[in-house]
């Protein structure tokens, strides 16, 4: 059946999922970060009783609510697409992938839904303590939601805690905690959530600088800037640290992705990390003999240090990963891509033989087939690969997006330091150049987050589940025209929703925060 699937169906299914995910991630990080910033502001109000902080928190809550509503809508569509466009994937790993999503829906979403109502409508109706708890629990619910979604995504990057059941043709969970607490999941969670805090901090600083540029709400703007910049600086530094941890996990579990991130074709000991480079557009395949770069600047030995925590360690490149033959940590020798493909075909053949023997009631043949399947099941997904070059992701896209993310991450650290120095040491309200810098930094926060996800998802192609299920085998057998139609429907729908959100937010920003009374209470 899979041989008859039109490649354009694969491309359009991927495009539709990417479209939904990109739009969804426009809203999620701002929700995660604003929850922390407005929680801190309300905590100050609770401790001081100064209603200025109450009105400050309420203003950012209003923007949080607008953003939260659109994020939920896009998230629901994203989850439904697993069943509509990726039914083979859903069947193959539904027992594992469904568990985190179910927990996210039952626990996190209902926590958010319960306490967000108190947060918005409970002012002066419940005690200040309970309202503060509701605000923080709303943010906690959003963060828990992110945890389980990212656990599911991390499992796709590094499938653990499961085994293949040939009787059901499914991968089934055998160790929930291995799935929930894998190092890949932990690093991905902290890196993604902290990047959301950075984006929200950039957003708050940028909006507040707009007020200063307009010579409005000076007290409100400066107070918001100071809190947001501290949150942003801490998050940006920690995000860089967790990014290092994520890089190490990628090197261990997805070496081809790491090689694509670096445009790294020929492995070596003491490998350097490319700080900046221009790829050779004429290089099309790993073995075409052409140089990978037109120009590059390297940090010596840094890639080995990142990937193996040893500046002298060998790091395999794309050619090494395709040809194999290099020593592994366990003392064995790496298989070539072609050898993995042959083992994958053996696994698929053994699975078919097992099902046929079971259907015929031949237990002896079934046991033999099951043994062969168990020996080769780790390479099951490779059996669907037709050419070794399919195992190489889009190198230019992965390489450049990785550098966009890293460069912007460094810029944000510098940005928050400058903002804090000016806010505490100078009169930031008079520095119109800084107002423009802050406002123009807002879209860069969104760009950094999207670039990170492009690296994570495009860098792991051709796999829907690393080494187990290629994207080409994960899709539903649909009519290409129907996928194209829904793609453009979603494109229009999401664009309208985005325009509506931006319009409502701009209206709320132009209106500004409520005026606090002149006295404290």
Where do the language-model regions lie?
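Polytopic transmembrane helical bundles with strong interfacial aromatic enrichment
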Residues: 1-521
